[in-house]
Regions:
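Active-site acidic carboxylates
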Residues: 1-77, 101, 127-134, 142-168
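Short, well-ordered alpha-helical scaffold segments within catalytic/effector domains
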Residues: 8, 92-96, 119
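Short catalytic/ligand-binding loop motif for oxyanion handling, primarily in non-cytosolic enzymes
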Residues: 33-37, 82-83, 118
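Short, surface-exposed loop/turn motifs that are enriched in glycine and acidic residues
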Residues: 51-56, 84-88, 111
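Short, small-residue-enriched loops and turns at beta-alpha junctions
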Residues: 81-82, 139-143
Length: 168
């Protein structure tokens, strides 16, 4: 995705430059086996996408420019579309449970895509009672229209928005 490599590098640089800023760093990733209609030869880039992040391929790995060592990686979307990190799990533990077990009450959300996975994860974090900030300089979105709509939804839900997203 356009801007994804720069986002991965920028996340790594920020975490390295401020190692005491976060108690925990976790990652989420698409981890597709057979997500059905989520994959399409003619994607609409809203509900359907080209094949990506397929288990057993290099594409499922976190980008090599993301040099952060996450405490846990939450896989999502094996057999159906999943946008929120809260739909995934790490070794059988879902993100909400992991955050509760680690007494997390605030979270910064970063990554791709601003208008899909970042939005869904941030909204679910707020629903879980977590004080949520999206660091927009560390995100990249699919399209200007969907990013603008997502930013409105995030703001309306009480998510703190900092910076400006990159848009492909």
């Amino acid at each position: 995705m356009t801007g994804g490599v720069a986002v991965a590098s920028s996340i790594s640089q920020l975490v390295a430059s401020e190692p005491d800023r976060w108690d925990h760093v976790v990652a989420t990733r698409d981890h597709h086996i057979d997500p059905g209609a989520h994959f399409s030869d003619n994607p609409d880039y809203v509900d359907s996408w080209p094949r990506h992040c397929v288990v057993g391929t290099e594409g499922v790995e976190l980008h090599p420019n993301l040099t952060v060592e996450p405490a846990a990686v939450f896989d999502k979307g094996e057999y159906e579309a999943a946008y929120s990190g809260f739909e995934g799990d790490a070794d059988g533990v879902d993100l909400a449970s992991w955050l509760a077990e680690h007494d997390v009450d605030s979270a910064d959300v970063v990554g791709i895509a601003t208008d899909h996975c970042v939005k869904a994860t941030a909204l679910d974090a707020v629903r879980a009672g977590i004080d949520t900030t999206v660091l927009l300089d560390l995100t990249a979105g699919v399209s200007r229209d969907t990013v603008e709509k997502a930013l409105g939804q995030l703001a309306d839900a009480g998510v703190t928005l900092v910076g400006r997203p990159k848009v492909g």
